[in-house]
């Protein structure tokens, strides 16, 4: 239920160093139960935005405005997400060996999650005389909810600038201060080191 979603998403995660973390942004698919999702997003606008998948964009995501006269959501931000681009990224990371930039999961990963996150594959089709590639379910009626969750999580992470966070943790090299010019006394000592 939506109440359970709100409860989980507002739960604090306590990092081993004691830092308390909460979800700062989540995207919720508004393609189904649109009005219910819009109402939920209005009530929880501090951390969730409605989103909708699309495949006709030049960018990974785009902010739009809901234009629904008579709705409480009229004027609210809607995030349009190119699911195909994010699925391409996820698939590419799954093919990488474990390590930085790869797709890794917890060793006791739930089988249902694993099956859903890999429930689609990319196929080549001819549409209106043009050859296009698109993501489709591997089998009829295959659940792909967790894959969609990962797509929206990746879009939310991009909106928050997560990919560049590692740059903030790297301290810039401090420029070395030029050594001051030696004083006349220091020069005399260097030139006459054997005077002692």
Task: List the predicted regions and their residue ranges.
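Charge-dense, low-complexity polyampholytic segments
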Residues: 162-175
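Extracellular low-complexity, Gly/Ser/Thr-rich intrinsically disordered linkers
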Residues: 116-165
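Mg2+-dependent endonuclease catalytic cores in nucleic-acid-processing enzymes, primarily RNase H-like
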Residues: 1-130, 172-196
């Amino acid at each position: 239920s939506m109440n359970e979603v709100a409860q989980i998403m507002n739960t604090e995660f306590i990092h081993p160093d004691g830092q308390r973390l909460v979800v700062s942004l989540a995207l919720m698919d508004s393609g189904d139960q649109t009005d219910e999702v819009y109402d939920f997003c209005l009530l929880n606008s501090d951390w969730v935005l409605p989103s909708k998948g699309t495949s006709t964009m030049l960018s990974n995501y785009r902010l739009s405005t809901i234009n629904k006269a008579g709705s409480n959501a009229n004027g609210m931000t809607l995030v349009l997400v190119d699911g195909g681009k994010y699925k391409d990224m996820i698939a590419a990371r799954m093919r990488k060996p474990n390590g930085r930039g790869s797709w890794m999961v917890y060793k006791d990963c739930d089988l249902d999650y694993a099956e859903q996150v890999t429930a689609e594959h990319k196929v080549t089709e001819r549409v209106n005389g043009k050859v296009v590639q698109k993501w489709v379910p591997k089998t009829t009626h295959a659940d792909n909810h967790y894959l969609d969750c990962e797509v929206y999580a990746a879009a939310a992470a991009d909106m928050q600038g997560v990919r560049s966070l590692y740059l903030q943790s790297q301290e810039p090299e401090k420029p070395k201060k030029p050594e001051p010019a030696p004083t006349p006394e220091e020069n005399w000592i260097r030139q006459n080191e054997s005077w002692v």
